[in-house]
Structure formats: structure tokens, C-alpha cells
Amino acid sequence: MAPSRRTFIHQLTSAGTLSVMTPVLSQFEIKQTKIKPMNNKIGFNLLAWSAIVSDELFPIVERLQKIGYDGVECAMDAREKSAYQRFGKHAHDLGLEVTCVLAVGPEENPIDGSLNIRQKSLDRIKWAIDRAHDMEAKVICGPFHSAFATFTGQPPTEKEYVRSAEVLRQAGEYAAQAEVTLTLEAINRFECYLCNTMGQLVGLVERVSHPNVKAMYDTHHANMEEKKFKMSINKVSPVLGHVHISENDRGTPGDGHVLWDETFASLAAHQYNGWLTIEAFTRNDPKFANAINVWREFSPTWEMAENGLNFIQNMCIKHKL
């Protein structure tokens, strides 16, 4: 049974105050000298702390900047416009860029049979584009091709791909006006059914056929759904617009069993020059953690940020990315 908007999406986007504030800088950060990859910017997804865009994230953003990140990624929640404007200004004042992540629920499902619900999905995506524009963000990523954790008990149908493409094509037109790129995410079979693999995702992006609608690659989901990392990156590379660096357990990148050398070598072979953004999860925001079934701490939060950045930089150097 599909979760209601109140019980799922509101959990994603209506979590409370931060439960873990920023401690003093570690010796890692004091000694860290930023090694810039040749072409790629490195970001960190703030869902590790909160699903809410608010001023409470400012100290965290400041510390991420001191560690050496190029940008931060925030969730698109239902807060007022001014919260996004303040957040964007604070990030840009620190010299950081912003990217965004969006999910939609069953009441805003782009593949629903109801035209009214599909219109609500388009309105929701347009709202997110407006908020991205408020923050001067250029990328919105996420699995908003269909509703998160909403299932019919059947495989995806041709009609559902057609409906999704129609909504996303209109969203792409709107995004172009704001100079925003929508990067769609294939996620695992336990969280959606429309796009689990790069093959399905590329097929959808090609149906949309709009320059402001591209694909993203998430290593966590690829580790579950793809036969080979190299083959899946080869498949998505012509339409690839964003990458999430995420370990198999959602902990510190490099500490698990994702095939990182194969991943970075394949990205380098295709001269990928977009964002490499760490997406790692914690229980710092209990409502969000419960909504995505995170029941334990995979790694200390700041260890994920510190060691994750160092890991990506070293992999970029190793594979000349």
C-alpha cells in the first residue's frame, strides 16, 4: 500500500531541528589543503543533517567550506521562499555553489492516471525550480520521474513512461527559463519501479528529449541494480548531468564494497566534468531517517565529510578525472 503524503513525503520534508550541531574543527580540517580535481566540483548533501532548509544549517555549511568542499546540496522542502534566498546567499557569500535534490509523493505522481495529480506533479517541480532559482542553483536532482515508494504491484507500463515524459518535458521548458538542469535519478527496486537501471533511465530521458532534462548516476543504487559499473556508466554517459558518490551502506565513501576504481575510471573515460556529490545518511534528522529506513549510524557524520572529500580527491587524481 502506498504511503500517504502525510506519512511519507512530509517526513522527508518536515523534519525538526538539527539534533547534532557542528563541533570544533578536527585536526584533519586544520591540516587539510584543498587538492582541486581537474574538472569536477565536489559537493556534500545536507540530508546527513536535515531535510529542512533553514538558518540552522549555516554552521554546517561553513564547516564544509572550511574542509574544502565546492558546494552543498539541499532538499527541496515546503518552507517559505525567504529561507531559500537566505540559504543561497549564505552559501554564495562563502564561495560555495548549491545543488538541490527533490522527491515527490503519491499526491504529486507524474505517472498517475489522473490528469489532476499529474498537474500537481508539474506544479511541484516548477515550485522546486523557482526555489532553486532563488538560491542561484543550477541543478535539481532526484527520482521525481515518479512518486517515491509508491507501487502498483505491476511492472512499469508504456503509458506510465509516456506520462512521466510529458510532465518532465514541460518541466524542462520551465527549467530552461531559470537556467536549471533537471537530473533524474534511477533508484533501487525497493524505492520505485519506473526507473531502477540506467537503461530505463536513459530511455526516459530520450523520450523527454529536452536539453534541460538529463540523468544522474548514484553509486549506491547502481551497486544494487546494475550488472557492471562500467557498462552502466557507458550507457548513461551521453545524457549524464550529475553524480552521487554514495557507499553501499550510505556511510563513508571508500569504506564499503562499491567498485570505486571502476567507477572513477569509467567517468574519466567519458570525460565527465559535472558534480561529484556525496550522499550519505545518518539519524541526525530522525523523521527523515525513519522515512528512508535508516536505523543505525553507518559512520560518524563529520568523518563521512572529511574522509569522503579526501577519498574523492585522491580518486580523481588517480584516474585523471
Each language-model region and where it sits:
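Histidine-acidic metal/acid-base catalytic patches
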Residues: A2-G43, S50, D55-Q65, K138, ...
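Active-site-proximal loop/turn and secondary-structure-junction residues that shape catalytic pockets
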Residues: A48-S50, M76-A78, V104-P106, S146-F148, ...
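Active-site acidic/histidine proton-transfer and metal-coordination neighborhood
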Residues: L12-T22, K34, N116-K214, S299-E303, ...
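Acidic-residue sensor for enzyme active/binding pockets
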Residues: E73, E185, E191, E226, ...
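Conserved dinucleotide-binding and phosphotransfer motif residues
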Residues: I67, L94, A178, H270
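Structural motif corresponding to the early beta-alpha repeats
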Residues: D70, C74-R169, N273, T277-K287, ...
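Catalytic-core regions built around general acid/base machinery
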Residues: R86-L94, Q170-A175, S232, E262-S266
